[in-house]
């Protein structure tokens, strides 16, 4: 099973748990001492603020400056770490564009950024393996191609994720099916 990371990563807890999962059965001995210590720290980390404020910035820096050390440990799992870290960086940008409010503002810059990120991430993943079958579950805002009612309010996201995938400029070459937020492509 390949974990396809099209959506942005909006939870530090989820990112920490995912990193621990990726490191679960890895052999750290091939990496240099600094990388080993970082990965052991992540693996044993119990405090969210330590992960967020210390270990995660080190991991991002390591990915940017010496990714080969991480690849020695992760091997084929490296792509999943890359996607998760990209998703986290996209979440930080989205939060900044949304003025750090908890809910995305419909019609705002953050909503448009998130739709762009979803589309670009899936496009990148699809280019890596265009013959695969993809399945995903997305919120109504990402998949409704017409107005929809939520909490008594009518919402509409211009150029939403699924509208782009179904449009004439789409990178997809198969059948796209959307039923109540479930997206499949064959």
For the regions a language model picked out, list residue spans one by one:
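Compositional signal for N-terminal targeting/processing segments
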Residues: 1-186
């Amino acid at each position: 099973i390949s974990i396809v990371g099209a959506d942005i990563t909006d939870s530090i807890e989820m990112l920490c748990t995912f990193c621990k999962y990726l490191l679960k059965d890895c052999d750290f001995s091939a990496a240099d001492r600094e990388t080993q210590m970082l990965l052991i720290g992540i693996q044993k980390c119990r405090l969210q603020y330590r992960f967020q404020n210390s270990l995660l910035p080190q991991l991002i820096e390591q990915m940017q400056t010496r990714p080969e050390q991480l690849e020695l440990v992760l091997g084929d799992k490296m792509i999943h770490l890359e996607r998760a870290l990209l998703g986290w960086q996209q979440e930080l940008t989205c939060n900044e564009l949304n003025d750090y409010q908890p809910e995305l503002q419909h019609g705002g810059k953050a909503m448009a950024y998130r739709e762009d990120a979803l589309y670009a991430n899936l496009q990148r993943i699809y280019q890596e393996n265009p013959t695969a079958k993809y399945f995903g579950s997305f919120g109504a805002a990402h998949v409704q191609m017409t107005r929809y009612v939520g909490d008594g309010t009518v919402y509409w996201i211009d150029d939403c994720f699924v509208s782009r995938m179904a449009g004439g400029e789409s990178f997809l070459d198969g059948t796209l099916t959307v039923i109540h937020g479930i997206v499949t492509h064959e």
